[in-house]
From Swiss-Prot:
S-adenosyl-L-methionine binds at residues 251, 277, 298, 339. InterPro entries: MeTrfase_TrmA_AS, MeTrfase_TrmA_CS, NA-bd_OB-fold, RUMT_ARLMC_TRAM_dom, SAM-dependent_MTases_sf, U5_MeTrfase_fam. This is 23S rRNA (uracil(747)-C(5))-methyltransferase. One of its GO terms (molecular function) is rRNA (uridine-C5-)-methyltransferase activity. Catalyzes the formation of 5-methyl-uridine at position equivalent to 747 (m5U747) in 23S rRNA. The keyword Repeat does not apply. Transmembrane segments: none annotated.
Length: 409
C-alpha cells in the first residue's frame, strides 16, 4: 500500500487509511508492506519513506527510528508544538496556549538505561523486550557514552550478568543530572547485594547508590543503599535547592520547570494552598518562597523526608504530611493543587467535586485521564476557567497541562 500520511493519532503516530505508522508525520509519502495489531489497532511494522513531509527535520540522534524514546525527533520543533496543542484539544475539548521548552536538547535530568544481554539503553519502539544499545542520547546528556561505557566495563570486569527478562544480576543503570548544579547521581538497580567496586567505575559521580530489586517487574525500582560520596545531589530552580535521591519523582525537564512553576502560581487565588501529591515539594517550596501558606501531602514517605530537608536547607516554613491524598481534609483552603500520577484521581475526584475549594489547579501529563476525572466527577461542580500547556517533553507527543478550575456560582 502506498499513500500520504493524513493525520496523527492521539498517541502521536502517523495515520493513513486507519493504519498507524510510527516515526511518520502528515505529508509523508510512505509505502507499507506489512502491518500488525497493536493495542487493538493496525500498525505498520514494515514500511519505507518515499517522499518526506515539509514538516520534517534531520534528527540529531543516530538511534531515531528504532529507539522508542523520541517518536517526533524527525519533526520540526515548531510543528511539534502545534500538534501537541491540537492533540490536547482533540482529547479534552480545551483550547490552550502552549509554551515551548527553553532547551530541546540535553534537557532531561534523568535516564533509566536498561542493562540487558543485548546492550545498555532504551526499549525499541513497539518491541518491549528489545533494547537499543545506545551510543548517544541527545535529549539526556552528552555524557551518555561515558555513563554506558563505565557500566559495560564494570560488568565485564565484575562478571555480573545483565538482565535477560527472566534472570540476571544488574537490571538498570539510572543516572540523574543536576542541570543547573552540574552534579551527577548514579544508581545501579540490581537483583543482588551491592558490589563496592562499583565506585571505581564512576569516579565522576557526586553520589552513588545500589538499589536491590526483589521483583522481576520491568521498572527501575528497588531498595536504595547509599555507597559513596554525597547522600543527595541537588537541582537549583529560582534560587531554591531541591535535594534529589533515588526513590523520588522530580520533573524531568529542569529547563522547562520554571515555566511550569510560574503557570501554577498564576492560576492560584488566595494565599492558603493545599498541594496534594506534593512529591519532594516541587510546587510547595516555590510557592512558599513566593509568600503562599502551603501544606503538602504525599504518600511516598521518602519524598516527604526529602521535601522537609529541602525546606530546612532553603529556610522555608512549609508543612509536609506523609499520607494518602484521600486521607487529608481538603476543606478550609483558598486553593487546591492536584498533581496526581498518570492514572489520575479516580474516585477521589468525587471528593474534590463535593468538598474542594473555589479554586483548583490540576496538573497533568495525561490528558486522557484528566478529562475522565473532569467529565465523571469534577464537571458537576467546576468549570474550566483557563489552561496552559508546557512542553516538558520535546520530541515526544507528550505535554504537561495546567488547568484552572473554578466552582460554579
Amino acid at each position: 500500500m502506498r499513500g500520504i500520511i493524513e493525520d496523527l493519532s492521539q498517541d502521536g503516530l502517523g495515520v493513513i487509511n486507519g493504519i498507524e505508522v510510527p516515526f511518520c508525520y502528515p505529508g509523508d509519502e510512505v509505502r507499507i508492506t506489512r502491518t500488525r495489531d497493536r493495542f487493538g489497532r493496525k500498525m505498520a511494522s514494515e514500511f519505507s519513506l518515499i517522499t518526506p513531509s515539509p514538516l520534517r527535520q534531520r534528527p540529531r540522534c543516530r538511534h531515531y527510528g528504532k529507539c522508542g524514546g523520541c517518536l517526533w525527533q524527525g519533526m520540526k520543533y515548531e510543528e511539534q508544538l502545534k500538534f501537541k496543542k491540537e492533540l490536547f484539544r482533540r482529547i479534552t475539548g480545551i483550547e490552550a496556549e502552549i509554551l515551548g521548552s527553553p532547551r530541546i536538547w540535553e534537557f532531561r535530568n534523568i535516564s533509566n538505561f536498561i542493562v540487558s544481554v543485548n546492550g545498555i539503553g532504551l526499549k525499541e519502539f513497539a518491541r518491549p523486550k528489545t533494547v537499543v544499545d545506545l551510543k548517544e542520547c541527545p535529549v539526556f546528556s552528552n555524557r551518555t557514552p561515558l555513563y554506558i561505557r563505565a557500566m559495560k566495563e564494570f560488568l565485564r570486569e565484575s562478571g555480573l550478568k545483565p538482565w535477560n527478562w527472566k534472570e540476571g544480576d544488574v537490571h538498570y543503570l539510572q543516572v540523574r543530572e543536576g542541570k543547573f548544579t552540574g552534579e551527577v547521581m548514579v544508581n545501579i538497580i540490581a537483583h543482588r547485594p551491592p558490589e563496592e567496586t562499583i565506585l571505581e567505575y564512576f569516579p565522576f559521580a557526586d553520589s552513588v547508590y545500589w538499589s536491590i530489586k526483589r521483583d522481576k517487574r520491568d521498572d527501575p525500582s528497588g531498595e536504595p543503599i547509599h555507597l559513596g560520596e554525597k547522600e543527595f545531589i541537588s537541582e537549583k530552580i529560582f534560587g531554591i535547592k531541591y535535594l534529589l535521591r533515588p526513590g523520588i519523582f522530580f520533573q524531568t525537564n529542569s529547563y522547562a520547570l520554571p515555566l511550569l512553576l510560574k503557570a501554577v502560581e498564576g492560576f492560584l487565588d488566595g494565599s492558603k494552598v493545599l498541594d496534594l501529591y506534593s512529591g519532594i515539594g516541587t510546587f510547595s517550596l516555590y510557592l512558599t518562597k513566593k509568600g503562599f501558606n502551603v501544606v503538602g501531602v504525599e504518600i511516598n514517605k521518602t519524598a516527604v523526608e526529602v521535601a522537609k530537608l529541602s525546606a530546612e536547607l532553603n529556610s522555608l516554613n512549609v508543612e509536609f504530611k506523609a499520607k494518602r491524598a484521600e486521607e487529608e481534609n481538603i476543606e478550609g483552603y483558598d486553593a487546591l493543587i492536584l498533581d496526581p500520577p498518570r492514572k489520575g484521581l479516580g474516585e477521589f475526584a468525587g471528593v474534590v467535586e463535593k468538598k474542594g475549594p473555589e479554586n483548583v489547579v490540576y496538573v497533568s501529563c495525561n490528558p486522557k485521564r484528566f478529562i475522565l476525572d473532569f467529565k465523571n466527577y469534577l464537571s458537576r461542580s467546576y468549570k474550566v476557567e483557563d489552561a496552559i500547556l508546557i512542553d516538558m517533553f520535546p520530541h515526544t507527543p507528550h505535554v504537561e497541562a495546567v488547568i484552572k478550575l473554578r466552582k460554579y456560582s
